[in-house]
Amino acid sequence: MMNRLFGKPKQEANALQTLDKLNETLEMLEKKEKVLLKKAGAEVEKAKEYSRAKNKRAAIQCLKRKRLYEGQVEQLGNFQLRIHDQMIMLEGAKATTETVDALRSGASAMKAMQKATNIDDVDKTMDEINEQTENMKQIQEALATPMGAAADFDEDELAAELDELESEELESQLLQPATTAPPLPSVPVPAGRQPARPVPQKRTAEEEELAALQAEMAL
């Protein structure tokens, strides 16, 4: 009698603690997923920069790291799905336990009133409960099966992805408006080097005589 009185609250407390722990783990996985997605996006931007710098090897390395981050994101998604399944099963099991307890209380009330119990019905109920428990155990074992494998990368596929990034970058550059070339700076004239002055040409004898005649006529 004492076990029935104090055992049930303890089981409910354990179930609530387990649900809280699963919720905390789920939130932690979601935060890690956001961080990995941010890192994957950063690797794509690095790949573009290396591609513009004609550093193809470094760009491919960035794409490899991006693939690794994406693989971890996918794995975290599977973990989150398993936790959701576990929470659903735990809540279902808790509801089942409460339902069974209610049925047992009803059976006790019926026994007090009728002073009789149909053992066949009890056996049938227990068989159904045992069957449900076994099915739930098999589902949990199936979900707990470890998974994961090392990622193999196809160099040709990575090169094709890099070519696609380069094409997108080239297209974005072609769509930008053309800019005018800056004017060339003026070259200062070194000190001491002034432009050459025209040298007066020497007059001929005829030109001197003509000039003298014009001067006399002016007088």
Swiss-Prot record:
Residues 168-219 are annotated as: Disordered. One of its GO terms (biological process) is intralumenal vesicle formation. One of its GO terms (cellular component) is ESCRT III complex. Residues 10-41, 117-176 form a coiled coil. Gene3D superfamilies: 6.10.250.1710, ESAT-6-like (1.10.287.1060). The keyword Transport applies. InterPro entries: Snf7_fam. Keywords: Coiled coil, Endosome, Protein transport, Transport. It holds the Pfam family Snf7. It is found in: Endosome. Component of the ESCRT-III complex, which is required for multivesicular bodies (MVBs) formation and sorting of endosomal cargo proteins into MVBs. The ESCRT-III complex is probably involved in the concentration of MVB cargo. Component of the endosomal sorting required for transport complex III (ESCRT-III), composed at least of VPS2, VPS20, VPS24 and VPS32. Interacts with SKD1. Interacts with BRO1/ALIX. Belongs to the SNF7 family. This is Vacuolar protein sorting-associated protein 32 homolog 2. The gene is VPS32.2.
